[in-house]
Amino acid sequence: MLRLEHVSKSFHAGADRVVAVRETDLRLARGDFLTIIGSNGAGKSTLLNLIAGLYPPTSGKIVLGGADVTSVSAHRRARHVGRIVQDPLAGTAPSMTVAENLALAMSRGRRSLRPALSRRLHSRFREQLAALDIGLEDRLRCQVALLSGGERQALAVLMATLVPPEVLLLDEHTAALDPSNATMIVQLTRSFVRRLDLTTLMVTHNMEQAIASGTRLIMMHKGQILAELCGDEKAQATVPELVDLFTRYHVVDDELLLERVL
């Protein structure tokens, strides 16, 4: 389903050169759910951006669904890649209505801006929003900017999966939310991933989320994958064991340390 072969990404040149991702190999089968942890600047978000096509790799190859997409633009790749980022506003069009945002999501990766908002389409959107169980079905004509952060992120989850993608990328998509909304979004995300059998990569600093979500877990540092947990090893992992893993590799995660203090 998704394969990265010796993928590297560098920024700048000469003395200012920064290697964000270094000779990374990764394979995910359909339905795999990979959680990614690591220190700040470890290359986690860069890895997701490379898969989304936002950056071209400096070297290496990216294969999606059997096709080499290394040189395919982010716009064309958007037909196959769903993406949810940290900022609830960034994943939506705040000045447009909920219905217009969903119509845009249906046109992801196509030439047309959005399909006509017919009564039939409104009815379909209402049913899909009602399934979220947070009251958005009554706010189809509401501007997204007027929604709460949790509501916007729930909408972003629906938009990213409205046309089921081959790969779903979650880049700290609960980090800007309060604990209650973060829990709601994680549960909602798992529900969509499970029901649609989506191949998923999730970046998070939340160790409990990393353990509870997904089938595999990797730890990154300085652009490299240092460790991987899967199967029973991941299912039985605990937060202290993940902290010990950071310590073993001399990795410092400031956000993790803050969580432990609080």
Region locations from a protein language model:
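ABC ATPase NBD coupling module
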Residues: 15, 68-82, 90, 112-118, ...
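The feature captures the beta-strand-to-loop junction immediately N-terminal to the Walker
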Residues: 37-39
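Helix-to-loop junction immediately C-terminal to a conserved catalytic motif
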Residues: 52
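Conserved ABC transporter NBD signature motif
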Residues: 60-67, 227-229
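ABC ATPase C-loop
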Residues: 160-161
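Catalytic Walker B motif of ABC-type/P-loop ATPase nucleotide-binding domains
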Residues: 168-172
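H-loop/switch region of ABC-family ATPase nucleotide-binding domains
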Residues: 204-205
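Conserved beta-strand-loop-alpha-helix hinge in the C-terminal portion
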Residues: 224-248
